[in-house]
Curated annotation (Swiss-Prot):
One of its GO terms (biological process) is negative regulation of cGAS/STING signaling pathway. InterPro entries: AB_hydrolase_fold, LYPA1-2/EST-like, PLipase/COase/thioEstase. The active site is at 125 (charge relay system), 180 (charge relay system), 212 (charge relay system). Its EC number is 3.1.2.22. Coiled coil: none annotated. The modification N-acetylalanine is found at residue 2. This is Lysophospholipase-like protein 1. It comes from Mus musculus.
Length: 239
């Protein structure tokens, strides 16, 4: 595992809760994007910010690094990959080092008084893949994981770790467009099926005719799921 300076600080965009903060959500963007860009994209789709009365949303930005699919060009990516395909090895050195960095972000929330069981991790595309590595390998005690248009490689170390058993398995919420021509729908479905076979409680929503993008239906389904995993302090709390 590559060493990561303890001083690494990820730029982030934060949407504060409208009421008392009692839970946190970390939303990881896709390759080449940014935390601010992810927030603005969601705001454009919903015609408003994704907000909650009690949940703080954190949109961090990945560091700029050489990215092999861009022939070594610099891009804001959570990790490197040899190509965008299920059928290749994972670039574990970069994945593991970023797990360390993002663990620091989780620790920051815990230090403010938020229990790990009140933290959700997820993301779009590469961000969803990163979230699965982070949660299932390093932080299995989080409230859940969400993946939008993402996948794991066929021989992912995530599967290898889960095969060992004896650990908590956060619930997985997954959405994928049926017309996705970058990250194929079949890749997302296969990832979901494999994790389910390893004991993960999963849901998978196919979005008809949706390419590699977000839509309102998807985000509304996500918001409903978030509230089942991170409910407010009272049953009658309005969102």
């Amino acid at each position: 595992m590559a060493a990561v300076p303890s001083a690494v600080h990820l730029p982030r965009c934060v949407v504060s809760p409208t009421g008392r903060h009692s839970a946190s959500l970390i939303f990881l963007h896709g390759s080449g994007h940014s935390g601010q860009g992810q927030r603005e994209w969601i705001k454009h789709v919903l015609n408003q910010d994704l907000t909650f009365q009690h949940i703080k949303i954190i949109y961090p930005t990945a560091p700029s690094r050489p990215y092999t699919p861009l022939k070594g060009g610099l891009s804001n990516v959570w990790f490197d990959r040899f190509k965008i395909s299920m059928d290749c090895p994972e670039h574990l050195e970069s994945i593991d080092s970023m797990c360390q960095v993002l663990s620091g972000l989780i620790d920051e929330e815990v230090k403010t008084g938020i229990q790990k069981s009140r933290i959700l991790i997820g993301g779009f595309s590469m961000g969803g893949c990163m979230a699965m590595h982070l949660a299932y390998r390093s932080h299995p005690d989080v409230a859940g994981v969400f993946v939008l248009s993402g996948f794991l490689n066929k021989a992912s170390v995530v599967y290898q770790d889960l095969q060992q058993g004896g650990r908590m398995l956060p619930e997985l919420f997954q959405c994928h467009g049926s017309a996705d021509n970058l990250v194929l729908h079949a890749w997302g479905k296969e990832t979901n099926s494999k994790l389910k076979s390893l004991g993960v409680s999963t849901t998978f929503h196919s979005l008809p005719n949706l390419n590699h993008e977000l839509n309102k239906t998807e985000l509304e389904k996500l918001k409903s799921w978030i509230l089942t995993r991170l409910p407010g302090e009272t049953d009658g709390q309005s969102e």
